[in-house]
Amino acid sequence: APDGLATWISYQTASGDQLTQSLIGILPVQSPSLLGDPKFCQSHGTRYAYHAGAMANGIASEQLVIALGQQGILASFGAAGLVPSRIETAIQKIQQALPNGTYAFNLIHSPSEPALEIGAVERYLQYGVRCVEASAFLDLTASIVRYRVAGLHQTNGGIEITNRVIAKVSRTEVARRFLEPAPEKYLKQCLEKVWITHEQANLETHVTMADDLTVEADSGGHTDNRPL
């Protein structure tokens, strides 16, 4: 036992019985801020290594994102299912309340309505949204590549990544794509549309598509029946 600590403790039960038991160990009080990886906090500017994920159609609302952000917890606004103009309103409200940027916005893959995905990315870039939670992607798209690569800059110390991506995945092959640089075909598409510069395209060959991964279980909503 540590110096000054007894190896046996005695206590009285509610019924009045006196019991003696051996002391196995002592667990000090742990602050929630000590849990998780401190690198997550450093990367996202949070107090806690927690992330409140996006719930679609604004269920993860501005009020929720703001309340958690004010307490040092990263939360994603539920932008899925909302038109770009509604997303723009949410960006303005959240940025006004959280000028230091402790927030994220959802970017959901919309294969049947690519204009929604493109419109969301355009708003995120226009307003300087620095973190998105990418969800429902079965493959990368030009839009998510555009968001990531448009935030790359060469500095004296290396490559600065201003647009962070948290990828929510349920398949290993999708996780692998986010843990690698963007494929050349998407970089070419972005260059042809003048979404990125040639310098940024070159920088992307040294940068993965995501900073963090969220492992998704199967759900009652849209699902690919393949939880990790």
Regions found by a protein language model. Give the residues of each.
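Active-site entrance/lid segments in N-terminal catalytic domains of soluble metabolic enzymes
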Residues: 1-228
